[in-house]
């Protein structure tokens, strides 16, 4: 099967993809601390892996290509730990606008922004109306683990959903980039299990992770992670994305 990855195709291949009215998946992620046991590139590794696997499942039924991953996002709340890059709001929107403009100029009309970092969600939701109006593209934005939230829950032991450097992300990294996981640091890789209870309040507030939420950089419990679980989690995430790509009503 030919590659679904933009970076592995020729310009001629990509002109053919545009002529076939392919959906462009644009992975957006982050480069930020992920506790003592995981590399800072977790969100980028996992988002790209899910996008690739989902596209490979869908490409038999719908033309699709995975654009290069935008590896920097909104990560101010992790800066105190070190190892983190972050955009401010105007820069993030400007970069996304430039990416979408390039995609449109090559003849593509449908773009699926697939996010892999919780800190990007609010910004993407806020940007979407303007980016859609300005670009004229059929444009969706999602977060890959939200697409499969109900299916992920069956594999989790203590957590209710995906958190940070947690059971889910650590298990998936044991599959996607196993050599980057420091297994000897797993005994200390845990924090509050189900996120900040203050999020239940009907008001918004900004809280940096280090001084307010976790001393380890972890929310959840990475001690529950294993590669077998990671395979299952990766599979359901890919299937959730593939289902969205193949949804004819979405892309009509």
Could you describe each region identified by the protein language model?
Residues 1-110, 118-252:
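Extended, histidine- and acidic-residue-enriched regions that form the cofactor-binding/catalytic faces
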Residues 113:
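Conserved SAM-binding loop
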